Amino acid sequence: MRYSKEIVNQIKIIDEVLYSLNLPSILKNEYFVTDTISCENYLKLHNNKPNNIFFSIILNSFGVQIDIDEAKEILDLSLSSPKEEKYFKEFVKILFTSFIRIKKYGKYYIKISFFNQKRECVKTIRYIKINSFSLNFKATLKEYAPLYLSW
């Protein structure tokens, strides 16, 4: 499929991360599946590596979005500046190479922590569904190995 200029540029940013890890392009990568509703101006890719965290990368003419587990729009950027492009690239590298811990309090509060190879926390994201309060629920914890190891 042919994609718009914006989508192609977003793919290039992701591919830079993959190439730095000596891996193939995201479009040729065995661990990513293209969603059936993808078209010229919209591309949705799902991670399908067995026993790994589920996440989606959504590329469109307005920017990028990343959903992790049940948390939607964990990252939502327009990529309209070099600073946003750099942040996106760094986030993708963390997503691809980190151990990930998901701590859920009900279905309305999710804490996602990313750990490097030394098991040091490098990033934490909190997802709270609007108009909800669920800290009274017992927390569930899941941990996932990195999609790719970085050396």
Residue ranges and their predicted role:
Residues 78-129:
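Amphipathic protein-protein interaction modules
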Residues 1, 44-86, 125-151:
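Intrinsically disordered, low-complexity regulatory segments enriched in Ser/Thr/Pro
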Residues 23, 42-50, 91-93:
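Short, solvent-exposed secondary-structure boundary motifs
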Residues 1-40, 121-151:
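Negatively charged, low-complexity tracts enriched in Asp/Glu with abundant Ser/Thr
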Residues 33-45, 51, 108-122:
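A cross-family detector of function-defining hotspots
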Residues 14, 57, 91-92:
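Generic hydrophobic, helix-prone segments enriched in Leu/Val/Ile
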Residues 31-36, 53-58, 99-105:
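Short linear motifs in intrinsically disordered
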